[in-house]
Every structure is written in structure tokens, then in C-alpha cells.
Amino acid sequence: MNNPNIYQLAVTGVQKLIPYKAGKPIEELERELGLTQIIKLASNENPLGPGKQAIAAIQKALPELALYPDGSGFHLKQALATKYALDASQITLGNGSNELLELVARAFLTPELEVVFSQHAFAVYPLVTQAVGATAVVVPAKEYGHDLAGMVQAVTAKTRLVFIANPNNPTGTLLAQAELEQFIGALPDNVICVLDEAYFEFVSQSAAINSIDWLKKFPNLIITRTFSKAYGLAGLRVGYSLSC
């Protein structure tokens, strides 16, 4: 074949991908629109920015930028393990929680398998599903949130992953502990529930769910979290997952 189109050499799922449209940087909007005072809400970035201790730690690390980082993230894993009373082996770090969603898809999906998630769910779920050639099964939303009964019914012998964001992104709906725990318990052992908790820090104390306790009960549960939102560190791209 002479002069092949390089895109035709990519796997089918990648060929059909529509790029994820992230919120535009303020500087880009200023150039496009000729404006100088823009308040950006598109990406749910923390308007307060990172904490003083985080800024101090970043400044302290600047002289080491010429060195490759610790690929295992030893110190961060140890800190998270201490915070959540887990073993460091239960923690996986990622380039934001987005990368962890991609890694889960690559690790567990093949073209003949299916992924279940809700309508109005995080836009990355269909992208990571399509990239590996798996089939997305989208369950109609219930009052802009998850129809858990409908999602259980959508599970078939081909289902390998279920994505749930709680609170949901972008609609903000919240599932209660009892109903979510019952849902995970209803899944077959060979169906992995990925619980995306990017916004869990914003839930009121009275409505908060201690999902980490479920790791002892559900070996098919993976929890993803991020430092991008509540901690104001979106620019550093630091996410992590918790599993059994």
C-alpha cells in the first residue's frame, strides 16, 4: 500500500472517536472574543485555587524539575494509605482520574464486551469505551440522575464495567448510601463497578457515603478520586483509585 492514510491504520474504535471538548482556557477566549474579564464555569475549576501548603510544596519541588519523578508515587500513596486506612497496594495513581478511567477500560474491556452507564453521565465514559472497541449501553436517566433499577436490568452476560459518578457529573444528582450499596451488591461478581467520586468532598456530612468501607465487601469495586476539584490542583493532573 503506497502512502497509506495513517488514520486508517488505527484501531476501529479510535478511528471513530470524537475528541473530548474540554473547557477552553481563559486566555484562548480572550483572544477569540476580545474580552478581558471572563469568569470560567465550564470546567468546574476551584475558584479559590490550591491551599497555601500545596503552593509551598510545589515551590519546594521546583529545583527538582530536571529529575524524573518517582514513578510509583511512594510518598503520595503512603499518605493516602494512612488517610484511608488502606494498604498502599490498594492505591493506583493517575494523570488525573481521567487517566484511571482509561486504564480501567484498557485493562478490562475487549471489543465483544459491554459497558453500562447512565444518560447524562460524564462525557469520558463513552470515549474510553469506544476507544477500546467495546459497546456502550446507555440507560435513560431518571430525573437527570441514575436509574439504578434500569442499570441492573441492562447488565448482560457481556457486561464487564459499570460507570457511576456520585455525585453525578454534570447534573449534580446524588445517590444515597443504601440504594448505591444495594446496586453494587446486585451486580454479578464478574462485573466491575467503577465509582467515580471526583466531587465527593462537596457532599454535606449528613449525606456523605463512606464508600471505602465497601472495598472489604465488594472485590469488584474500584473508586476513583481526584485532587483537581476540592483541592484546586487541576493543573497538576493528580488522581487516584482505590480497590481491594
Model-derived segments and spans:
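PLP-dependent aminotransferase class I/II
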Residues: 72, 220-244
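Short hydrophobic alpha-helical segments of the AMP-binding
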Residues: 80, 128-129, 187
